[in-house]
Amino acid sequence: MRLILWLPVLVVVLLMVMEGPAPAQGAPDVASTFRNIPNSLKEFGNNLKDTFESIPEATRKLMTSFAEGIKNFRIPLL
């Protein structure tokens, strides 16, 4: 009975051993990485600028919606 239970495990282990080690990852090209840094920084700066420019409009919309909510708020009479 034990042999029947261990047989699938043995098959899987043998398949893993026969497969061998996983292939190594290729080394990244350092020169292309350094060439891409200025573009990445420029894109990050543009995204940051756009985000900060949208803050006043988003704040204005939020305050307007709060003002509308307060204006429409009614306290029920007891």
From Swiss-Prot:
Cystine residue pairs: none
Primary location class: secreted
GO cellular component, one term: very-low-density lipoprotein particle
Location(s), subcellular: Secreted
Keyword field contains Secreted: yes
Keyword annotations: Lipid transport, Secreted, Signal, Transport, VLDL
GO molecular function: fatty acid binding; phospholipase inhibitor activity
A single BP term in Gene Ontology: negative regulation of cholesterol transport
Keyword Secreted appears in the UniProt entry: yes
Signal sequence annotation: 1-26
Function: Inhibitor of lipoprotein binding to the low density lipoprotein (LDL) receptor, LDL receptor-related protein, and very low density lipoprotein (VLDL) receptor. Associates with high density lipoproteins (HDL) and the triacylglycerol-rich lipoproteins in the plasma and makes up about 10% of the protein of the VLDL and 2% of that of HDL. Appears to interfere directly with fatty acid uptake and is also the major plasma inhibitor of cholesteryl ester transfer protein (CETP). Binds free fatty acids and reduces their intracellular esterification.
Family recorded in the similarity comment: Belongs to the apolipoprotein C1 family.
PANTHER family per the UniProt record, alphabetical: APOLIPOPROTEIN C-I
Name the UniProt record assigns to this protein: Apolipoprotein C-I
Lineage of the species this protein comes from: Eukaryota, Metazoa, Chordata, Craniata, Vertebrata
